[in-house]
């Protein structure tokens, strides 16, 4: 069974790649260079894909800085730092990129139909503190209907299925799953800041560090700055 994997190089997407392999899929990964602040993640995506031994890794290029609207695509919007986990859960954060997962899933759908894949794996996580609207179960259900209605395969009764194995998992549970699957955490990248070393203070770094700490595990990545989460 062929599967397209949305791979950012982060903790979640790397876990779903290894899950797809464990599910017996022939894996094709797709990453996106949308001129994001943290383009460093693309290097990690390549390394994770290479280590996993997938069939093909694609990088799609487009520029979401053309209209911005997010701290990840507009340098005039400050990146949140040193926020508590409770503070992260209050509102949809400025790191939300408008319609990003819809854009990503559209590319993944086209890729999947072109190679006659049966699945698209995405690492969305509704229980995380991000609050992103395009990481929630109702969104995935709606996009599944788009997959069914908007493709030849779907209209012929063989829709491409969206697989979101992390949707109801906590970050700690994702790490535990990744450990079981053999995910190389040292190759992954979560930081939003855009440096060569993970900052340790952006929301993404703090979520990751807090999860490793809760499990009593050491995150193998070096960090520029560490403070209790």
Swiss-Prot record:
Cofactor detail note: Binds 1 zinc ion per subunit.
InterPro entries xref list: QueC, Rossmann-like_a/b/a_fold
Pathway this chain belongs to: Purine metabolism; 7-cyano-7-deazaguanine biosynthesis
GO molecular function: ATP binding; ligase activity, forming carbon-nitrogen bonds; zinc ion binding
Annotated positions binding Zn(2+): 191, 199, 202, 205
Cofactor: Zn(2+)
Membrane-crossing segments per the record: none
One Pfam match: QueC
Source species, domain of life: Bacteria
Any Gene Ontology biological process: queuosine biosynthetic process
Role noted for this protein: Catalyzes the ATP-dependent conversion of 7-carboxy-7-deazaguanine (CDG) to 7-cyano-7-deazaguanine (preQ(0)).
Record HAMAP family: QueC
Protein name, entry field: 7-cyano-7-deazaguanine synthase
Originating species: Nostoc sp. (strain PCC 7120 / SAG 25.82 / UTEX 2576)
Top-level taxonomy: Bacteria, Bacillati, Cyanobacteriota, Cyanophyceae, Nostocales
């Amino acid at each position: 069974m062929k599967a397209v994997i949305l791979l950012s190089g982060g903790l979640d997407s790397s876990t779903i790649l290894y899950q797809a392999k464990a599910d017996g899929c022939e894996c094709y990964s797709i990453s996106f260079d949308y001129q994001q602040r943290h383009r460093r993640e693309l290097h990690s995506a390549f390394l994770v894909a290479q280590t996993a031994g997938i069939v093909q890794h694609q990088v799609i290029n487009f520029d979401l800085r053309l209209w911005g609207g997010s701290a990840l695509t507009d340098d005039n919007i400050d990146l949140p730092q040193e926020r508590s986990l409770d503070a992260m859960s209050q509102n949809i954060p400025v790191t939300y990129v408008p319609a990003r997962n819809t854009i990503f899933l559209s590319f993944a759908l086209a890729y999947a139909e072109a190679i006659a894949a049966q699945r698209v794996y995405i690492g969305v996580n509704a229980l995380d503190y991000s609050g992103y609207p395009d990481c929630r179960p109702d969104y995935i259900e709606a996009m599944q209907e788009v997959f069914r209605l908007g493709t030849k395969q779907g209209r012929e009764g063989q829709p491409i299925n969206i697989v979101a194995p992390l949707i109801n998992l906590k970050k700690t549970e994702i790490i535990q799953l990744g450990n079981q699957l053999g995910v190389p955490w040292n190759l992954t990248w979560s930081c939003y800041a855009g440096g060569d070393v993970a900052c340790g203070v952006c929301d993404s770094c703090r979520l990751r560090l807090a999860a490793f700490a809760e499990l009593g595990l050491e995150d193998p990545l070096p960090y520029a700055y560490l403070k209790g989460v």
